[in-house]
UniProtKB/Swiss-Prot annotation:
This protein's UniProt keywords: Ribonucleoprotein, Ribosomal protein
UniProt superkingdom: Bacteria
Record-stated family: Belongs to the universal ribosomal protein uS2 family.
GO CC field: cytosolic small ribosomal subunit
GO biological process: translation
Cross-referenced HAMAP family: Ribosomal_uS2_B
MF GO annotations: structural constituent of ribosome
Designated gene of the protein: rpsB
Protein name (database record): Small ribosomal subunit protein uS2
Organism placement in taxonomy: Bacteria, Thermotogati, Deinococcota, Deinococci, Deinococcales
């Protein structure tokens, strides 16, 4: 039995690809036809890839693995953050900062700075500072929360990343490839399948399509590990990957 039915894929519009002028020839094997200037994705192949990808996610989750959710395009931001929070997984929905994976040690210093500022404000000690400094520190805190708040509990490199639109998130995919971190992706007809380890060929623009795939992944994580905000923290204590990998690659 498949994790997702053909009916669900059709109703969510997963089969609608990009305009034929926007495509990657390497994606050809997942295309069924072209109609009115739009590529139609072969949902039979999508179903096979869903089973393969979701089997991997289920197995990884049962072993305590951590998946970093990435979706910075407008249609994906809210959905990706919601499912990541529901499962306790780290996420990036604002902008991918170069080095988030390959220079993770430096990224941790930004997270530590955010924690320091949070303590300053929450303790009330911020009121001991001059008004101009309070405003400056408040802006810094807000900026750090926006960019690294979703990964603040990520104490080591993730075991995999899930990406909505790997073409847009090309830097995240490149960093994961460089470190040997598996990439799971909802990928449209403009994507390069060769840089994706577990591809779900489908519409990565439509909200219903993004929601169907991302929510089902969330369900898998909850079912495998019970869900909750502590899921990622537990996973951080397990697995073989550490931030030392990033340092080795940088060296």
């Amino acid at each position: 039995m498949s994790y997702i039915s053909m009916k669900q894929l059709l109703e969510a519009g997963v089969h609608f690809g990009h305009e034929t002028k926007r495509w990657n020839p390497k994606f050809k094997r997942f295309i069924f036809a072209e109609r009115n200037g739009i590529f139609i994705i072969d949902l039979q192949k999508t179903l096979k890839q869903v089973d393969r990808s979701f089997d991997y996610i289920k197995d990884l989750s049962e072993r305590g693995g951590v998946i970093l959710f990435v979706g910075t395009k407008k249609q994906a931001q809210e959905i990706v953050e919601l499912e990541a929070r529901r499962t306790g997984m780290p996420f990036v929905t604002s902008r991918w900062l170069g080095g988030m994976l390959t220079n993770f040690k430096t990224m941790r210093t930004r997270i530590d700075r955010l924690t320091e500022l949070d303590e300053l404000f929450e303790s009330g000690r911020i009121n001991d500072r001059l008004k101009a400094e309070r405003i400056k520190l408040g802006a810094e805190r807000e900026r750090l929360q926006r960019f690294v708040g979703g990964i603040r509990k990520m104490t080591r490199l993730p075991d995999a990343i899930f990406v909505v639109d790997p073409t847009k998130e090309v830097i995240a995919v490149q960093e994961a490839n460089k470190l040997g971190i598996p990439v799971i992706a909802l990928a449209d007809t403009d994507s390069d399948p060769d840089v994706i380890d577990y591809i779900v060929p489908g519409n990565d623009d439509a909200i219903r399509s993004i929601q169907l795939i991302t929510h089902r992944i969330g369900d898998l994580l909850v079912e495998a590990r019970g869900g909750g905000e502590d899921v990622a923290a537990e996973g951080m204590e397990q697995g073989a990957q550490t931030d030392e990998q990033a340092e080795e690659v940088q060296a």
